[in-house]
Amino acid sequence: RMQPDLQNQGYAVGMAAAMAVLRARGKVRDIDIKALQKELVRNNCLEKRVLKDVDSFPLSQASIIEAVKTLEALTIDVHQKPQHDDTHKALAVVISHPQESIPLLKKAYTQTSKPEVKLNYARILAILGNQTGKKTLIEAVKKAPDWGKGWDYSNQRKYANTFGPVDRVVIALGFLNSADVHAPLLEKLNQLTLKSPLSHYKAVCLALRMNKDASLAEPLARFLKEKKLKGHNQTLGYYDIKKKEKNVYVRQGVNQEGGSMLNNKFKELLVAALLFECGDYLNQGREILEVYTKDVNGHFAEYAHLVLNNGTAISSTGG
């Protein structure tokens, strides 16, 4: 059923690339979009009405007000179907219009008496860089008795790369970029064990990375040691020229439950990279990263190289 769509998309991309080379010095952003649309209409890739369509952005104030109202019903659970949560369009409206949305979100946050709705608005405001809901987010993280539901990396499409409710509040807290979040985030980190789901590690490391500070280095190093997070790498023997017998580790895959080897590596590397980015402590972060540059899992090796060479795993535009 998707074949016609893919064919049309492929033709459109090819046409755009050709126009860029012929008429825009290779810059696709500079091509004449109307001319491209006319060609695609001529070839029945697009309907004729497209030539009369106008840009919908920026949206009207009324649309933004309605979107903010709709977000009262935003849920925090994992859903893939709109019948469970149809607020995602409203969220897109708000996120794409931050300047207009923030005053409305702040008003809605202040006026609501429902804790779950207040948390909704606090999360959105934090992601938009506004600290109005900081107290609510900190309290939500502190009051969560544990981490709740979480998932390891696995071969399951629905849950392999997602976050649980507490994970999502922790990530939102990280967006505040304030020293006030260090203590609650470290407290949440210390609740984790080696067997804790990977999604919890990803959430707290992402949140702390957005608030990285030298004061976090020693607690992170202690966490690595006390939680037995170190030593899960599989260094390939051919890197050691003095070693006569060369081992050839088999890269471990994942199953429906995940697989401990790959997930344990993931956890160790995330915390070590965060430690390194916070200034390191007794070179512990660097030592782990250097070992992983020779790991059998190439994606971990590449990640370790990236952090060591750039001092961070986040681009200059991302954090």
Where does each model-flagged region fall?
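Alpha-helix capping and helix-loop boundary segments enriched in small/acidic/polar residues
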Residues: 1-5, 27, 112, 160
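Short inter-helical turns and helix N-cap capping residues of alpha-solenoid HEAT/ARM repeat scaffolds
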Residues: 113-114, 145, 162, 193-197, ...
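A conserved FAD-binding loop/helix module that cradles the flavin
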Residues: 1-17
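Charged, amphipathic alpha-helical linkers/stalks
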Residues: 40, 47-87
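Structural detector for internal amphipathic alpha-helices that build alpha-solenoid repeat scaffolds
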Residues: 81-97, 107-110, 116-131, 139, ...
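Amphipathic alpha-helical scaffolding segments comprising HEAT/armadillo-like alpha-solenoid repeats
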Residues: 61-78, 98-111, 130-155, 178-192, ...
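Active-site-proximal substrate-binding core of FAD-dependent oxidoreductases
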Residues: 18-52
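C-terminal/domain-terminus segments
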Residues: 289-308
